[in-house]
Amino acid sequence: TANFGGRSVQIVVGYRNLEELSEKLKAFSYRVLKDECLDLPSKTYMKRIIKLTPEQEKIYKQMKHLALAQMEGKMMTTATVLTQLMRLQQINCGHFTADDGTIKPIKNNRTVELLDTLEEIHGKVVIWAHYQYDVETIVEHIKKEYGANSIVTYYGKTPMNERQDNIQKFQDPVSPVRFLVGTTQTGGYGITLTAASTMIYYSNGY
């Protein structure tokens, strides 16, 4: 159990009885690997280096020094360390969550780099982000650049009754929807997005 902001959260630290679980599932399930049922081309990975803005760099250094000062001579909890790491990552993404819970935007180069990348790409694109704020920022910029009908979402704030419809729109070759933006926490598993030839990780998880 870890404590996040005064809230106790159960954390998985290991697994037990996996062989027993596997035996019980064998009677009514079978496993098929992706390469056994789909003829897919090899994946090609490409990294983009994005320079921090002066404002980002200043805030990042301030937060880093604060975290180091808190750590000196103290035993920090796992939750506290994760919170500091999360804030540093948020700053890299162009925002951070203040102590009062409000989200503060920071001038950054990510959205410009994303739009430049999209100009180079033909076909449909899946864009993953780690934070809901990032998803909403991406949606705002893509709608402005490509129109409101060009994009659908699949993340925590997407209503349950719209999620499957959004996938169908994205998968439909005649649909005007070209972009699907979501979080891997919500849409990273169990959905089919084979209409896309490109997948972009705008911000990674841990």
Question: In which residue ranges do the predicted regions lie?
Answer:
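Short beta-strand/turn micro-motifs composed of small residues
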Residues: Q89-N92, A129, Y155, S203
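Helix N-cap/beta->alpha junction signal
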Residues: K107, H130-Y133
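Phosphate- and divalent-cation-binding pockets in alpha/beta enzyme and binding domains
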Residues: I59, D134-H141, T192
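Short glycine-/polar-rich loops that comprise or flank the Walker A/P-loop
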Residues: K43-Y45, G147-S150, A195-T198
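Inter-lobe coupling linker of SF2 helicases/translocases
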Residues: T1-G123
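Conserved helicase ATPase core of P-loop NTP-dependent helicases/translocases
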Residues: V126-W128, E136-V139, K143-G187
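Conserved RecA-like helicase motor core of SF1/SF2 enzymes
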Residues: Q185-Y206
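Short His-Asn-centered micro-motif
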Residues: Y15-S22, W128-H130, G182-T184, Y202-N204
